[in-house]
Amino acid sequence: MKTRTLALMGAAAALALSVGLALAGPGEPGHSHKSFAAGEPGDPTKPVARTIEVTMKETDDAKMLFEPNKVEIKRGEQVKFVLRNHGQVDHEFMLDSIENNAKHKVQMQKNPDMEHDDPNGKRLTPKDSNEIVWRFTKAGTFEFACLIPGHYESGMHGTVVVK
């Protein structure tokens, strides 16, 4: 009886795993079923049109900022953002629409320690660096922002204009 029960449990587990893998779809780089306002995750195996270095830091007069804070991109371009936290506190880079970042900012007020390692956002500790490869498939004005409570209000946001 034990052997039969174990065999049935094993078969059920295998079936559940195969159904989950089938629903997951292809695992190719840059492929995602999630929709993003600012485009889609890029494919790191393909060349980028350019690399944009973005520095995060605080100033002596208590401001927090990104350098640069405005970027212009051609629709269809794949770019690599190299993110560097030169500050003394954690910062994040969230790329989305202004409206979506505003909604996310409300969530961050409730959970300020929320970690980000998403296709469109990264949280960095001081002196840390990371990268985001992104393909801008939609024209418009988008925003990158640090949504850690108080950082946006201290000036930590920028604009991406896609033409």
List where the protein language model places each region.
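Extracellular/periplasmic metallocenter environments
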Residues: G25-H33, D118-K163
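Divalent metal-coordination and catalytic microenvironments
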Residues: V54, F81, F93, C146
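Histidine- and aromatic-enriched segments that form or immediately flank copper-ligand environments
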Residues: Q88-P126, Y152-G155, T159
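N-terminal edge beta-strand
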Residues: P47-Q78
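Asparagine-centered strand-capping/turn motif at beta-strand->loop junctions
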Residues: L83-N85
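A short, structured loop/turn motif at beta-sheet edges
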Residues: P44-P47, R75-E77, R135-A139, K163
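Short structured motifs
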Residues: A37-A38, L65-P68, E115-N120, S129-N130
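Extracytoplasmic entry segments of secretory-pathway proteins
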Residues: K2-M56
